[in-house]
Amino acid sequence: MTASDTVYLFQSLADRSKNPQERSLFRNYISEALELLRETPSSPTVVHEQCFRFLANSCSDNNENRAAFFNLGGIDVLKPYCSKDNEYSALAFAVIHNCILDSREYRAQVADAQILNLAITYWIDWQHKLKAPFFNMLSFVCEMLYPFCKDCSLVFMGLQLLPSMVREGIDPFTIFAKAFDNSLVCVSFAQNPSMLIDSIDLVRNMPDFTKKTDMLNLFPRIAEHDAVLSTSLHADPQFLDFLESCFRSDDSNSITMASLFIGNLVRRDDIAKQLMQKDFLNMLISCIMQEKDVDGNVERVYACCAALRHFMIPVSSRAHFAPTAILLQEKLASSRFTQLHYISASMIRLSMPYILCELADHPERFYKLKDWSKSPDFNLALESNRTLLGFVKHYLTVPKSKEKISAFFKNNINLFEESVVTVLSTESKYPIVIGEAVFVAILMIKHGYANVAQTIIASPVYEALKSYRDDPNLAYQLKQNVRSLLVLVEHR
């Protein structure tokens, strides 16, 4: 067969394999195409071009052809083309793109062959010469391979393409979100603080683009991976200095990103204690209290509040933070955004029992919780009712509560009873919350507040409790507590 015959054959095969119904008919030609490509000439010819076209079309949405391609060592054949600095590299990447487009199994094989590194390098070198379809194709290759990446340097390399992505209308967030979902990449970043800082700066220093805020907020996801908390990132002086510089800046996006990072790092008790010794707490509080336009900068304020709330999760630190929770309530209550009301209610809930006197002395703070407990926002209403239940629990379990707390409790007994019933009405998919309400209801009845029992029997909650008692999806201890409550209710 002459060279022209070979060109004609593979051109014909490439054209016909555009038809999904015919692709399987040409499977035997995959080995021949790879054989022609195996000897990579310094200047590929039209024969090579048609072989690439045939492989790309025949492996599109055809698992049997893809299997043949990989079994015949197709990636090893194409890899030298991917590393060449010419237009044929784009055709080789097109074949790879079609082979892995909807196949997770083959993506892992391709990732092991360092194709992601080659794709990014080729994009960097050819970004001013490629046409739009090839940009889209390379972006999909990166997006599909980042979940299998093990080295943060490949993310750093990819971020250097942000100007090209923005210029070509490609959404970088979709691509890099896959990388930050990858625990190996995130641990790699945590072990390389300098590269992490440089990567953040690549995004920060970009002129504004549509997803800039979202892109910056990908970096705190690093600390969402539990494995990262076992690294020394939280103790790295360079990284902590960098976060501090973000708080000192006037850049709202940087402050938000730094707050989210701190919040995710302090999920572990010992890290929270270490970072409490730094000045980050005062930075977070100052950022919130000095904010003149809460609603105009709601993302920044929320991020700071969320970080503070994470500091409060360890029981050992709650007494320290209780005054802060009360201090912030008025500021956050001024917002029209219910997510800020929610986080305020949550911080107050975690501050029990250290603020019972404060709530009794300043009933306007308490009645703000009452208002929130009736909010149409389900999450806000539920969290506020949980906070009211927290007041009851700590009042009834703390020995010798002060008289003013006792008087305050009795004056608002109807509200507390209402909260018990409201929370007990919650769907069983919130077992922890239901458990809290069951426990508080038992406490109230045992302390002589029998009206709770009457309220429960007179409401649909009574039937719900009986269904919880025998629900196989609920924990044994919760069902036992429900049974105890029903006994108390039915014998009043």
Curated annotation (Swiss-Prot):
- Report the InterPro entries cross-referenced here: ARM-like, ARM-type_fold, RAP1GDS1
GO cellular component annotations of the record: cytosol; mitotic spindle pole body; nucleus
Query: A GO molecular-function term, please?
Result: guanyl-nucleotide exchange factor activity
Respond yes or no to whether keyword Nucleus is given for this record. Answer: yes
This protein's record includes keyword Metal-binding? no
Q: Which UniProt keywords apply?
A: Cytoplasm, Guanine-nucleotide releasing factor, Nucleus
Q: Alphabetically, which GO biological process terms does the record hold?
A: establishment of cell polarity
Q: Where in the cell is it found?
A: Cytoplasm; Nucleus
The free-text function statement in the UniProt record for this protein reads:
Probably acts as a GEF (guanine nucleotide exchange factor) for the Rho family of small GTP-binding proteins (G proteins) that stimulates the dissociation of GDP to enable subsequent binding of GTP. May also chaperone the processing and/or trafficking of small GTPases independently of GEF activity. May be involved in the control of polarized cell growth via CDC42-mediated signaling. May also be involved in the control of cell-wall organization via RHO1-mediated signaling.
UniProt protein name: GTPase-GDP dissociation stimulator arz1
Q: Which organism is it from?
A: Schizosaccharomyces pombe (strain 972 / ATCC 24843)
